């Protein structure tokens, strides 16, 4: 029985989909004005893991992850760069897709762009106006009137008075209340705009997600996810918009992943500890970064540091080493490739399922992987290695060739030895040993060791891995 922590009710709830056997899920994606940072990577990996587990439970998942391709930040960056906003967003969408692919992210069922759904947004704003939940200001902007929505603040757990006291809101004389938020922004010179009943303009950020989720998933869907930073005001405002239009809750389970911290400090450009995914991938294999993310529970803070990434790299290496040392024969591998995981009788599989059904507890699931590796090392039984790979695959891990993974440079940007060069030196060492020139053979081994290359001599010959 799958249980999910629902942010709205602040409780673990049994997951019961609206339609048996099917799951509809929406996750807030990137605003594409820059490269993905570690916070984006966490959202991508966390909800990719959620989708993978739901599919493992035989649900048919419709997964929508939007792209915000029109926003104040995008417009400012395009003006700074003296380029069309469409060229800017196209470049960063391509970069995002490359980063997601590197991290092993399954493509969503739909990945709508805000600029493709303007008509749906206009229709939704018209409905809010007709219900008296929105108003057109003197400057042509359209605002949501938060005082007209009785449930405002229920996701963040705060009243309007609490929110007014705690929020730093810029004074806008066009608003009736400081917490009122914009649904439609009147056109300004040198900014992209679209036609609407209120004149040319562009949508506000919050209406984009309400319109896109409703367009692709309907008035009500199962799961809405995103980073903790979106809980207020973005998701609070989505509730006000969608419930305001439809008259009923539009999401059954709200999921939020925790913040990313860097060396126990908040990640920010002002502190100089801001890292893009590309900067991290220049130093670590993508699978190490994914493994680092799934080792932490999705709702817990994730503390990034070189020490933690190095620890994740070493831990993942132990799992791949177990796979390499205890790989099944070709015949066994072919047989086990068609076999399904025995969730009923296999104790390791049962523990893995219990962990994932407990609010996607990936740290406990990863612990099962290490127990399997230990059992494979203890018994030499390839069955445990096969199960290790199968369960790891559910988390998007351990699907590379163990030998290739272990031969990949630990820190790509610092790698000074190609595979061809390493193989050449190994052959030179083998030749030296044949000629009983053990001094030269030892010197070559030492030279490789100093470069972080570990040689392993065995009955089948010499293999190697990076330290």
UniProtKB/Swiss-Prot annotation:
Gene3D superfamilies: Cysteine-tRNA ligase, C-terminal anti-codon recognition domain, HUPs. Disulfide bonds: none annotated. It holds the Pfam family CysS_C. The keyword Transcription regulation does not apply. It is an enzyme of class 6 (ligase). Binds 1 zinc ion per subunit. GO terms for cellular component: cytosol. Its cofactor is Zn(2+). Belongs to the class-I aminoacyl-tRNA synthetase family. Monomer. This is Cysteine--tRNA ligase. It comes from Nitrosomonas eutropha (strain DSM 101675 / C91 / Nm57). The gene is cysS.
């Amino acid at each position: 029985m799958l249980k999910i922590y629902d942010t709205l009710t602040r409780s673990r709830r049994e997951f019961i989909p609206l339609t048996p056997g099917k799951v509809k899920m929406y996750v807030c994606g990137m605003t594409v004005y820059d490269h993905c940072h570690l916070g984006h990577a966490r959202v991508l990996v966390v909800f990719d893991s959620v989708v993978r587990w739901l599919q493992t439970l035989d649900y048919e998942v419709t997964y929508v992850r939007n792209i915000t391709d029109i926003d104040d930040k995008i417009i400012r960056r395009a003006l700074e760069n003296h380029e069309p906003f469409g060229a800017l967003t196209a470049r960063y969408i391509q970069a995002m897709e490359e980063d997601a692919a590197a991290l092993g992210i399954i493509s969503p069922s739909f990945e709508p762009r805000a600029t493709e759904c303007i008509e749906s947004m206009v229709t939704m704003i018209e409905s809010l106006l007709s219900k008296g939940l929105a108003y057109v200001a003197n400057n042509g902007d359209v605002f949501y009137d938060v005082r007209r929505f009785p449930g405002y603040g229920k996701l963040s757990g705060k009243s309007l008075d609490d929110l007014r006291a705690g929020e730093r809101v810029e004074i806008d004389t066009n608003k009736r209340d400081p917490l009122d938020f914009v649904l439609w922004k009147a056109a300004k010179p040198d900014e992209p705009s679209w036609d609407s009943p209120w004149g040319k303009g562009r949508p506000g950020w919050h209406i984009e997600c309400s319109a896109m989720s409703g367009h692709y998933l309907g008035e009500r869907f199962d799961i809405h996810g995103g980073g903790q930073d979106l809980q207020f005001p973005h998701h609070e405002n989505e509730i006000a918009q969608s419930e305001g239009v439809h008259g009923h809750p539009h999401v059954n389970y709200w999921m939020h992943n925790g913040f990313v911290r860097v060396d126990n400090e908040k990640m920010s450009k002002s502190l100089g500890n801001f890292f893009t995914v590309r900067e991290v991938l220049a130093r670590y294999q993508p699978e190490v970064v994914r493994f680092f993310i799934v080792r932490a529970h999705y709702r817990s803070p994730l503390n990034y540091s070189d020490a933690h990434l190095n620890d994740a790299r070493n831990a993942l290496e132990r799992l791949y080493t177990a796979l390499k040392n205890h790989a099944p024969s070709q015949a066994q591998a072919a047989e086990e490739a068609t076999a399904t995981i025995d969730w009923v009788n296999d104790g390791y599989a049962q523990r893995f399922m219990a962990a994932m059904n407990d609010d996607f507890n990936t740290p406990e699931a990863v612990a099962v992987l290490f127990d399997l590796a230990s059992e494979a090392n203890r018994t030499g039984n390839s069955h445990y290695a096969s199960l290790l790979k199968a369960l790891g695959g559910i988390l998007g891990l351990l699907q590379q060739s163990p030998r290739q993974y272990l031969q990949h440079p630990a820190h790509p940007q610092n790698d000074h030895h190609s595979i061809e060069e390493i193989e050449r030196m190994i052959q030179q060492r083998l030749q030296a040993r044949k000629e009983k020139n053990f001094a030269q053979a030892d010197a070559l081994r030492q030279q490789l060791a100093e470069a972080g290359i570990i040689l392993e001599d065995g009955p089948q010959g010499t293999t190697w891995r990076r330290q």
